A protein has these predicted regions:
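Extracytoplasmic metal-acquisition and chelation regions
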Residues: 22-277
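Bacterial N-terminal signal peptides
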Residues: 4-17
Length: 277
């Protein structure tokens, strides 16, 4: 009886090519933090994601662990990149090691800053599904289910963001304005922003004080130039749109950001908290 069970187990492994109960996950190196979030969600428990690049404390994209992760990748490791340029920037193409890189686009038709756009992410997620399914056809139903869940939850998060509809927000972010548009905010972008981003702050204090008097919240993010972020630090009427941690569920994180911004807008700052040099 025991020999028959062993033979059956071996037969199943040979037929499927993978022993799911042996924690045989699909190892995939990923080129960019935004893609890490997508591959992690769509892959679920079937995929072990290896981030080649991450966000540092300032929100900049940097090589993970000072390049150690990339150096330790084995020849032939499966990898996902947005396009060839993204793969080369991540060190997954054009190096001495040959990785099995799957580029999702040729090339990606938008700026990399468009990736977090709620109207863009679900389409990129579909390409992630295709890549994972080519490597692991057996788990296609799982990946398809996760894609459907991702699309539904992103839509749900944007619906939560509708609490901000018609709220006026001054956008001084580098790449997060699309989140405001998706939520139906009235977005204003100052004409002098390019000059302020270069450190010429003439008129900025008066502009911010005027916004504050009109109860208009100003939003920045990690892509806002550092010189401008430093100037704005400490003001209670500034909201910073954060980068998601790579181990977070992105639709939930997006929903939390919308709620946090709404709380910022409806909470009036205490008198005297916006004094600035």
């Amino acid at each position: 009886m025991g020999n028959k069970v062993i033979a059956l187990v071996i037969g199943v492994i040979l037929l499927t090519g993978r022993a799911g109960w042996c924690d045989d996950k699909l190892n995939i190196a990923v080129s960019h933090p935004w893609l890490v979030l997508l591959v992690s969600f769509i892959g679920g428990t079937e995929v072990n994601v290896i981030p080649v690049r991450v966000w540092n404390a300032n929100g900049d994209v940097v090589v993970a662990d000072r390049g150690r992760v990339l150096r330790e990748l084995e020849e032939g490791t499966k990898a996902v990149a947005l396009d060839e340029d993204d793969a080369k920037e991540a060190g997954l193409m054009g190096t001495r090691k040959n990785f099995a890189v799957r580029c999702l686009y040729s090339p990606f038709p938008l700026s990399i800053n468009a990736l977090p756009d709620p109207s863009v992410m679900p389409f990129v997620a579909q390409r992630v599904l295709t890549a994972l399914s080519e490597w692991d056809a057996m788990n296609y139903p799982n990946y398809q289910r996760r894609l459907a869940e991702f699309q539904a939850r992103m839509s749900s998060s944007v619906l939560v963001g509708q609490v901000l509809k018609d709220s006026t927000v001054c956008d001084m972010s580098g790449a997060s304005g699309v989140m405001l548009q998706a939520a139906g905010c009235r977005v204003i972008r100052p004409e002098e922003l390019e000059r302020w981003e270069k450190g010429n702050f003439a008129g900025l204090r008066e502009y911010l004080d005027n916004n504050r008097n009109q109860e208009i919240t100003t939003m920045i993010d990690d892509d806002t130039p550092a010189v401008l972020k430093r100037y704005l630090s400490g003001r209670s009427d500034i909201y910073k749109w954060e980068r998601p941690p790579l181990d977070r569920d992105y639709p939930t994180f997006l929903q939390e950001q919308y709620i946090s911004l709404w709380q910022k807008i409806v909470t009036k700052p205490l008198p005297g908290m916006n004094r600035k040099r």
